């Protein structure tokens, strides 16, 4: 049944399949990466998304009020985004989640780290919708704690660099569009983990801001 379902999805839908990367062959440690450039291509085929992304060029930074981060100086003064040319701005989000009962005996044994991305070009009211959030990486949280983020994020960062330097050809628009990550979003523990800090609230400096 699973094979037939997968075959049907591949045939009738534009499925971007995950790619398995090996972290430690001896220990059988792996992670899954969903190719971001292919995902971007599929998402940009949606006419509604196209319309909102194209409109963003005219509206970014045009408000005299702070309605989103696009109205702030950090975005307006960014040389990559501040021009008239259309740029794709992405938000990355990192978080851990339990796939077992968090109060049961299997707590933390099967915790998974997910890395997601969202179009920052679309209106802020739409960014928190589940349909606007796309998965990029899945890895066991214990493997990341042992081996670090560098190996797990390597394929994602390599293709993001390609997006920034070479761009992505969008057939429906008939041109190459460049883009990059504007910011990385996470809760306090997730941000400390990505930044290489201790994930604890017990110390005298409980967050990365206290260190400074």
Report the location of each language-model feature.
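General alpha-helical segment detector with a strong preference for membrane-spanning helices
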Residues: 5, 21-26, 99, 212
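Alpha-helix capping and helix-coil boundary motifs
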Residues: 1, 14, 45-46, 123, ...
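Long, charge-dense tracts
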Residues: 1-18, 22
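Domain-level cores of phosphate- or acyl-group-handling catalytic modules
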Residues: 71-212
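Structured nucleic-acid-interacting core domains from mobile-element enzymes and related host factors
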Residues: 25-108
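Generic detection of short hydrophobic beta-strand segments and adjacent strand-loop junctions
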Residues: 17, 21-23, 34, 135-136
